Amino acid sequence: MSTSTPVTEEPRSSSQMTISASTQELAELINIHLGDLRPEEPSWRVADSPISGRGIFATREIAAGEELFREHTLLVGPTAHRSMNLRTCTLCYRLIPGSTDSAALCPAGCGLPVCSECRDSTRHDLECKLFRKWKPLESQRIEPRALRILSVVRCFFLDEASRKLLYAMQANMDRYYMQEVQRAADCFEHFPREQDMLDYFYRTICAFNTNAFESRSNVDGHEVLVRALFPLAGLLNHQCTPNAAHHFENGETIVVCATERIPAGAEITMSYAKLLWSTLARKIFLGMTKHFICKCVRCQDPTENGTYLSALFCREQGCRGLVIPVQTRTLQPDWRCITCENVFPHAKMAKYQDFALNTINNRINSCSVQDMIHFINELCPRFCPSSNYVLIEAKLNVIWRMTRFDHEEYTPEEMGHMDRYREEVLAILHKLGAGECTLKKLITGEIQ
C-alpha cells in the first residue's frame, strides 16, 4: 500500500445536472432498490440536508457499532488499474487460469475476460451481445479502457425503477467526464452515436463519478479493486470525523455502521477522504474530486484535536519545534512554529512536505518490511515528525503487509515494532474521536 497526497490545485469547476425526483420520490426509489435488505423499521430516513443536498438522518438513537444498513450495488465494474491482473472475470472477479489475454477473453468475440462458469450466464449474454454489436477493435488483447467503462455500460440493462433512481441521484458535470465517453468510443468500431443514448451514457458517468465507491473483492485469494454505485450509501454527506463508516462484504455489498452514538434527528455522515490525512491533503482531495471545500470542526482546528497530522519540523536554525498551517480556509496557508512562533510561507513548507512524501513513497514501493521498519525508526525522525500523516501511512503500510498480505514469519522484535505502530495509530484515531471506525476494526482484526 503506497501513500499519496493530492496535487495542490484549485478545485475544477463543475455544475450539477437537474435531479428528476423529489426527496420523497428518491426515498421511495431507495426502498425499491433495497428490496429484501430494507429493515422493517429503519433507524434512518432520507431528508434534505443542511450540509448538502439530500442526506440520511437518524429516526431514533443509534448505538455505537450498530449496523445502519447494508446495500447491494446498482452498478459495478472493474477499475482496470495498471496494477490489476486484467485476466479477471468481469462478473465473479476470479482470476482466470492461463497466461495469455486471448485465453481469458470470451470466445464469442465481445472482448471481455470471463471465466468458464460465467460465460453462459444471462448477465454475460446481455453484455456480450451489446459489445459484439459495437464491434470491439481489439480481439486478442484485453483492452483496459473497455473494462473501465463496463460499470457504466451496465446502465443499459437496468430496469425502469433503477433507471429512475439513477436520474434521481446527484450528478455533477465535468468537462473531463466527456473524455471517458470518447475513450470508450475509441475501443469500438460501431459505438452508439444516437443522442439519447449518449445523453443517458453521460448522465450515468456523471452520477457514477459523483457517488461511486472503490471497493475490494477477494475471491479465492485474488484481490481486485472495483468501482461500485450504492445509491443509499451515496447519500451520506461528508464530515472529516464522521459518525458512521462503511466496509464491504464483497465487491458488490456495502455495510454501514455507526462509529459513535448518534442521537435521534442527527444527520448520519461518513468521510470521503482518508481519516488520517492532514487537513490540507483532505481539502485538496475533496476540492479536486468532490468539488467542495470542507469547513467542518476538524478542518478549522490547526492541531486536528492535538494529533498534529500536518506537522513538519521547524526550519529555523536551532529549533526543532513543530510547524503547522495557521489558516484553515485556504489551500495555501502560512505555517507557524508552535515553539519559536516563526512564520513560514506555504511554498517553502510544501516543498518539505513533498520531500517527505516522495522519500517515504519511494521506500514503500521498493523496500522489504524489515527495511521499512529500519527506515521508519532510524531515518524518518531526522526529517519528519512522528505525527506527520505521511509517516503514519508508512506505519499502516507495515501493519497491512505483516498482517494481511505477507505470509512470511517475523521475529519477535519485528512484531513488537508493528504492535507499537498499531498502538500509535489507534491513539490518533482516539484523539480524533473516530470511534468504532472501519480503520480501527481493520487494525484490530475485527473485520478482514
From Swiss-Prot:
User: What GO biological process terms are annotated to this protein in UniProt?
Assistant: methylation; negative regulation of gene expression
Report whether Transcription regulation shows up as a keyword of the record. Answer: no
Q: Which SMART domains match?
A: SET
Q: Output the SUPFAM superfamilies linked to this UniProt entry.
A: SET domain
**Which Pfam family is one of those matched by this entry?**
SET
Give the E.C. number(s).
2.1.1.-
Entry GO terms, CC: chromatin; nucleus
The SET domain sits at 42-273
What GO MF annotations does this protein's record show?
A: histone deacetylase binding; N-methyltransferase activity; protein methyltransferase activity; S-adenosylmethionine-dependent methyltransferase activity
Q: Which UniProt keywords apply?
A: Methyltransferase, S-adenosyl-L-methionine, Transferase
Domain of life the protein comes from: Eukaryota
Going by the record, the broad EC class of this enzyme is: transferase
Family, according to the entry, reads as follows: Belongs to the class V-like SAM-binding methyltransferase superfamily.
Protein name from the UniProt record: SET domain-containing protein SmydA-8, isoform B
Naturally occurring in which organism (per UniProt): Drosophila melanogaster (Fruit fly)
Which gene carries the instructions for this protein? SmydA-8
